[in-house]
Amino acid sequence: KETTSKKAVEIAEANEGSWAIVGLHPIQTTPDFHDEEVIGEGGKPFASKGEVFNKDFYRELAKSKKVVGIGECGFDYFHTNVDSYSVQEEAFIAQIELANELNLPLMIHTRDPKMGGVSPTGRSAYEDVHQVLKQYAKVQGNVHFYAGTYEQAKKFFELGFTVSFTGVLTFAKVYEEVVQAVPLDLMHAETDSPYVSPVPHRGKRCEPGYVIEVVKKIAEIKALPLEEVEEQLLKNAKRLYGVEF
């Protein structure tokens, strides 16, 4: 949203080795209350106001050399409120258009309905995100906090997108098959802090520095030397965001 995007740019500009991505998260597009079940372990409950994506505001923010992407944007179906689809779609397309205009990569948010929930389209969020990207996106990007299948991931790869994995890998074996299948040069490691801290930091507020635990787990799953995985993931980040460090 506008306030947090502005703050992210301020933090990035004040700290060497930090960059910012600016945009409007899909759950911020409708007025609602988001508790820990919705936002994830480690987050503080908050109320969204139903913000409209102001392209001029974000275009101005993106003039900073520290802004390296647009997002996170996409579809969040975790709520059963099927009426939110149209406003999420409108904000998503507007952010894709801005990314195209500025030639910046997209950070994609994709979340399926909770158990027993209903998708507003009858399809998975991954399918709907892919369909919109295929129609509108002229830039590449990353599908963050990836929790889809390898078959779904391949469709994103065909569009020039990568996927990223979080600390969930360290305690949920269900993702190991996907991690094993995804080529190392098409993935990233992330924390999604302050949420879902990896082992051995479970129960604590997640921090960006904990990403090393995700990298270690990827190396373990792929049976590769840690140094090789670290080197390739750094290359991937530099390639996607056009940064040097």
Protein language model features and the residues they cover:
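Mid-domain alpha/beta scaffold segments of enzyme catalytic cores
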Residues: 1-245
